[in-house]
Amino acid sequence: MWIGIISLFPEMFRAITDYGVTGRAVKNGLLSIESWSPRDFAHDRHRTVDDRPYGGGPGMLMMVQPLRDAIHAAKAAAGEGAKVIYLSPQGRKLDQAGVSELATNQKLILVCGRYEGIDERVIQTEIDEEWSIGDYVLSGGELPAMTLIDSVSRFIPGVLGHEASATEDSFADGLLDCPHYTRPEVLEEMEVPPVLLSGNHAEIRRWRLKQSLGRTWLRRPELLENLALTEEQAKLLAQFKSEHAQQQHKHDGQA
């Protein structure tokens, strides 16, 4: 997969190219990341990249000419088929379904805004899609772009050490992940659930599914509204709710 970055601070992306899963993907040739700074396309000696907004108001906007030239350079390097994405609070909110959708593209160009944003005409003429990572404001689009790159790269074949890792991630099937445990078996009198030590893979699978369903019901119930539960899932969720109610009743009795 090839990803082009338009950013005033391309050095920030060393966090992606040099470390962790994405760093290994770059090293192994599974992910290629290039960057262009609008500052390199500025024509004045001060390398100006911001300009005042028409109509007044606080803050500045990214200057049109250097930004467009940087986008055009990235498009030329990418060749045909590159999708241009602007990271913006006004965009579609990124979720696992969106990540899976974006991962089908072989080439992405990510435009990272700064200041108060970019000229609307640049969005209309140069941008294919706008994406947001949440309903809050950041200083620029670099962190959202890194979030998108990290999540999308997990779908590239060979990037993860275990083939099932991406499919078992939280949200991969619309549910939150189940609890996980490692050594020691007992930590401050808290024991690993016995089923995980049983070696019974069928029961372990059922336990994990039940915990995943239950955790989603407790923490993100709206996610369940969009799912058509199987008969097994519905039964396991009912069991979890019953067990949870019993635990709550027991806890209330001890309080």
From Swiss-Prot:
The keyword S-adenosyl-L-methionine applies. PANTHER family: TRNA (GUANINE-N(1)-)-METHYLTRANSFERASE. Specifically methylates guanosine-37 in various tRNAs. One of its GO terms (biological process) is tRNA N1-guanine methylation. Homodimer. The gene is trmD. Its EC number is 2.1.1.228. Gene3D superfamilies: 3.40.1280.10, tRNA(m1g37)methyltransferase, domain 2. This is tRNA (guanine-N(1)-)-methyltransferase. It catalyses: guanosine(37) in tRNA + S-adenosyl-L-methionine = N(1)-methylguanosine(37) in tRNA + S-adenosyl-L-homocysteine + H(+). Its main location: cytoplasm. InterPro entries: Alpha/beta_knot_MTases (IPR029028), tRNA_m1G_MeTrfase_C_sf (IPR023148), tRNA_m1G_MeTrfase_TrmD (IPR002649), tRNA_m1G_MTases_N (IPR029026), tRNA_MeTrfase_TRMD/TRM10 (IPR016009). It comes from the Bacteria. GO terms for molecular function: tRNA (guanine(37)-N1)-methyltransferase activity.
